[in-house]
Amino acid sequence: MTITPQHLIALLPLLIVGLTVVVVMLSIAWRRNHFLNATLSVIGLNAALVSLWFVGQAGAMDVTPLMRVDGFAMLYTGLVLLASLATCTFAYPWLEGYNDNQEEFYLLVLIASLGGILLANANHLAALFLGIELISLPLFGLIGYAFRQKRSLEASIKYTILSAAASSFLLFGMALVYAQSGNLSFEALGKSLGDGMLHEPLLLAGFGLMIVGLGFKLSLVPFHLWTPDVYQGAPAPVSTFLATASKIAIFGVVMRLFLYAPVGDSEAVRVVLGIIAFASIIFGNLMALSQTNIKRLLGYSSISHLGYLLVALIALQSGEMSMEAVGVYLAGYLFSSLGAFGVVSLMSSPFRGPDADSLYSYRGLFWHRPVLAAVMTVMMLSLAGIPMTLGFIGKFYVLAVGVQASLWWLVAAVVVGSAIGLYYYLRVAVSLYLHAPQQPGRDAPTNWQYSAGGIVVLISALLVLVLGVWPQPLISLVQLATPLM
């Protein structure tokens, strides 16, 4: 095939982030300078975000048989880039106190972002696998970045071994799907699956193995066992990336696969996904109830959030609103998670050993950092799905989609899960306003709101509130992000 200037414009975000990786590599080789490499990374990610406007002007197209650039890909690419940008911003003050190599952190985040962009544009099972590996491999290093901390190293080893096992399941599943259908492209799969082939045992086994692999990456029950330990052990900025960029990119590509190849038409697949969604919602929320570590709590809550999203995925064949629901929910989840993990990062910076992730560290925060406590409260209310926040709009969409598709037992699970979630989110929010302990632990810097990380956290809180009251701009944006059929 011939690569035209139009194709290059369509690939701009991928090319810009790739070029930034090379520039940062050369910069590290030439001279170690933490500020320079952090600045180069942030400039590259901002340039990639700006380039999405030019991609939109170029229109939707298939760049290669592996990649399709359309409104859907642009939305998910934008969300991944925002999460990567926030991760780099939170990491800078944290790394200031880190005595080992600081610069490689940005390199790993950029390479993982490349994987996220590839996943957002993937239109082929080979691109899906390449993207997942490209986002997972840098995470092995990022999770164990504070390798002198026992928990960080343990989390990295745990994630590496389990991730390798999940990837092998995913690859074997793809092989079985290919053996039965003879296709790897999403669209070609859709055409071949339309002939009553969905009942073939080999194909169902292939999709079953793929669900195991993807379920691990999305930390769905029962493939979730790594999640709380890894969230707790990883440095706070890495937990931010893990909770947002990697989940959004992988869910985006699964959404596209289900859209083109009507896998959800199979009753067996729908039942299995329904059970996984139900278990993720209930188990994730119940396990979060007893947590006293805020990163573990957010880890368990992310399991339940992916369960809510799975309800919209199961309802995908029932109506157009499912895609809108997923887009709005993921945007709300992104900003709420960035704010919550951003507060933990600010409290844990600069690096001084373990993060400030104990709930006790946040007790009475309001009395000496009132704005930071207010931001954390807004994020907890949004994650709980309280009205006037963006989280409520997303949860309302999911419930509407579930009702539209007559998934009554999953709608009941969402309602019960939200009620349980309200308890532990409010427990975090209330502890911020209790009497401060006699010997306060870690604290955010006095001028935190003037730092780049502080600005990101404040913008996230503002977006959660403004879009919670007036969600139309976000809904219009998500409606524009339609995939090329």
UniProtKB/Swiss-Prot annotation:
GO BP terms in the entry: ATP synthesis coupled electron transport
A Gene Ontology term for the protein's cellular component: plasma membrane
For this protein, the Enzyme Commission number is: 7.1.1.-
Swiss-Prot/TrEMBL catalytic activity: a quinone + NADH + 5 H(+)(in) = a quinol + NAD(+) + 4 H(+)(out)
The record's keywords, sorted A to Z, are:
Cell inner membrane, Cell membrane, Membrane, NAD, Quinone, Translocase, Transmembrane, Transmembrane helix, Transport, Ubiquinone
Q: Which InterPro entries match?
A: NADH-Q_OxRdtase_suN/2 (IPR010096), ND/Mrp_TM (IPR001750)
Q: Does the keyword NADP apply?
A: no
Where it sits in the cell: the answer is: Cell inner membrane
GO MF term set = NADH dehydrogenase (ubiquinone) activity; NADH:ubiquinone reductase (non-electrogenic) activity; quinone binding
Alphabetical list of Pfam families matching this protein: Proton_antipo_M
Q: List the disulfide bonds.
A: none
Q: What is its main location?
A: membrane
Protein's UniProt keywords contain Transmembrane: yes
Residue ranges of the TM segments:
8-28, 35-55, 71-91, 105-125, 127-147, 159-179, 203-223, 235-255, 271-291, 297-317, 326-346, 373-393, 408-430, 455-475
Membrane-topology descriptor: Multi-pass membrane protein
Q: Which HAMAP family does the protein's record reference?
A: NDH1_NuoN_1
Function description: NDH-1 shuttles electrons from NADH, via FMN and iron-sulfur (Fe-S) centers, to quinones in the respiratory chain. The immediate electron acceptor for the enzyme in this species is believed to be ubiquinone. Couples the redox reaction to proton translocation (for every two electrons transferred, four hydrogen ions are translocated across the cytoplasmic membrane), and thus conserves the redox energy in a proton gradient.
Supply the PANTHER family for this chain: NADH DEHYDROGENASE
Q: Which family does it belong to?
A: Belongs to the complex I subunit 2 family.
Q: How does it assemble?
A: NDH-1 is composed of 13 different subunits. Subunits NuoA, H, J, K, L, M, N constitute the membrane sector of the complex.
Q: What protein am I looking at?
A: NADH-quinone oxidoreductase subunit N
This chain's source organism reads: Salmonella newport (strain SL254)
Q: Which gene encodes it?
A: nuoN
